[in-house]
Design a protein with these regions (language model features):
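Nucleic-acid endonuclease domains
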Residues: 1-96
Length: 96
């Protein structure tokens, strides 16, 4: 799964809501997966909304797709989720 941060540590929008046109993920089964940033955010946002941005109820070491994670315990305002690569690969993409 890919970690998608949507609120930065200072509480502002993060890279998935930024100005880049594309996001590249380093992969093992092929070198790079390149997707449109806006399409990625639209997909992730929809999945987060379907869950009402709910946090994971699993232990911290078990990744739950599209659950909201944060580091508020450490005084940080960031929020992120884990997006399965299978979902990301359904977006229009380039494998390099």
């Amino acid at each position: 799964m890919a970690c998608v941060e949507y609120v930065g540590v200072a509480g502002f929008h993060c890279w998935v809501q930024g100005e880049a046109d594309y996001i590249a993920f380093k992969r093992i089964k092929y070198p790079w997966l390149v997707v449109n940033r806006q399409a990625l955010w639209d997909m992730v946002k929809q999945k987060l909304e379907e869950r009402n941005y709910s946090p994971s109820l699993k232990p911290w070491y078990e990744k739950e797709a599209y659950a909201t994670y944060d580091r508020s315990f450490f005084g940080k305002q960031d929020k992120f989720c884990w997006a399965p690569f299978e979902d990301i690969e359904e977006l229009e993409h380039i494998k390099l």
